[in-house]
């Protein structure tokens, strides 16, 4: 529906509140009140910087995982102290330090990857990437699929579905996100870089 944007005098506070709301996953609806309301919980700039520090991301565990595309596959799970999302990498073929891997960064997409949605081509792209990596492994190389838990390009499943409703009204993806007060691009690609570093992939 229609909305009205109003400039704020306390822009820095609002920007920080927006970032905290994004981290908490409660966008697009929240209230910012500059007046004191009960006991305050102080948040320092360093707290946000600490949360965004991808050096905290570590390998939690790994296991052999034969898949349809390739019997020789391994899944690697990653965790960070301050982030509840668990990203995974799927290693196709035998990992070798002297071979540059075929890499795909794939953002989680429940509707496309699992449900076969026709609103996106995420599912077919995922299948094609795994097939290409299997071919690479058959030739003696290897591949790494980085599956990032960043649904809807980082805006979350519920907000993605809200954007779908707006798209049905004639708005494109960017316009729909903007009308919901969401960024055009919210994926965190630094996480993918850290995952590759932990996997020992110096080149892609």
Language model regions located:
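Catalytic domains of riboflavin
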Residues: 1-204
């Amino acid at each position: 529906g229609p909305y009205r944007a109003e400039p704020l005098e306390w822009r820095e506070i609002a920007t920080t509140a927006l970032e905290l709301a994004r981290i908490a996953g409660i966008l697009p609806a929240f209230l910012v009140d500059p007046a004191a309301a009960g006991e305050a919980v102080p948040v320092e700039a360093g707290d946000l910087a600490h949360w965004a520090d991808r050096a905290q991301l570590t390998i939690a565990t790994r296991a052999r995982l034969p898949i349809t595309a390739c019997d020789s596959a391994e899944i690697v799970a990653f965790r960070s102290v301050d982030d509840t999302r668990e990203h995974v990498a799927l290693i196709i073929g035998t990992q070798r330090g002297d071979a540059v891997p075929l890499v795909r960064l794939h953002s989680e997409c429940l509707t496309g990857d699992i449900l076969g949605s026709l609103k996106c081509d995420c599912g077919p792209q995922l299948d094609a990437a795994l097939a290409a990596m299997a071919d690479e492994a058959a030739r003696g190389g290897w591949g790494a699929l980085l599956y990032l838990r960043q649904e809807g390009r980082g805006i979350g499943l519920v907000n993605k579905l809200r954007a779908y409703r707006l798209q049905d009204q004639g708005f494109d993806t960017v316009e729909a996100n903007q009308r919901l007060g969401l960024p055009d691009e919210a994926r965190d690609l630094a996480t993918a870089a850290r995952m590759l570093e932990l996997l020992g992939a110096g080149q892609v």
